[in-house]
Amino acid sequence: MLADDAAVESVALSDSNLLDRFGGSGIHVSMSTIAPETARDLAEHHAKKGVAYLASPVIGRPDRAATGTLFLLLAGEGNAKQKVQPLLKVLGQRIFDFGEKPWIANTAKLIVNFNIVAAIESMAEAFTLAVQNGIPRAKMAELLSETLFSGVAYKGYGDHVARHEYEPARLSIAVRLERRAPGFTARSRN
């Protein structure tokens, strides 16, 4: 998975003729989190070269990838999706199919990321209120993540927020996502 839109475009659309190397029967599965507009442009470029383009951004951190327990969002041409299913099943515990338009999977992923950022912000505010009233941050994290909010965002990020652990790479992605989310939501449309 590449870091951002520029990296994906650099690899897929550079002078290296990557798309020509695929030939008419190739399938490019992009698992990066990129803007829907970028995915739409990539799909158009791929179609011109006769290469199938699938978007399959993932939900899960590197430790989930190592254990094959990612969640995968998938969109693109049906036959191409069918061909890559065996590979994707090795990487993830579940595949969510978002239809024929690749950029829809990227839109769904950015919506997920927006909710992760909202959860992190909510936890930070809750922990601040807790500390101001004599409740330890760790105790509040435990309460939230084991009762009302037992989902991945609270369990996966709650302890880090409670311990003020934002680096290396634990929550730095959230800062980048938060910067992108307002622009994404303002521009998003099908």
Question: Where on the chain are the PLM-derived regions?
Answer:
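Rossmann-like NAD(P)-binding element
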Residues: 1-37, 71-73
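Helical "substrate-binding/catalytic lid" subdomain
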Residues: 104-190
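Rossmann-fold dinucleotide-binding core
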Residues: 11-12, 33-113, 117
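A short helix-coil junction within the Rossmann-fold of NAD(P)-dependent oxidoreductases
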Residues: 18-22, 45-46, 129-132
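Structural signal for hydrophobic packing residues in well-ordered secondary-structure cores
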Residues: 2, 46, 88-95, 148, ...
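Short phosphate-engaging motifs
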Residues: 7, 38, 79-80, 122, ...
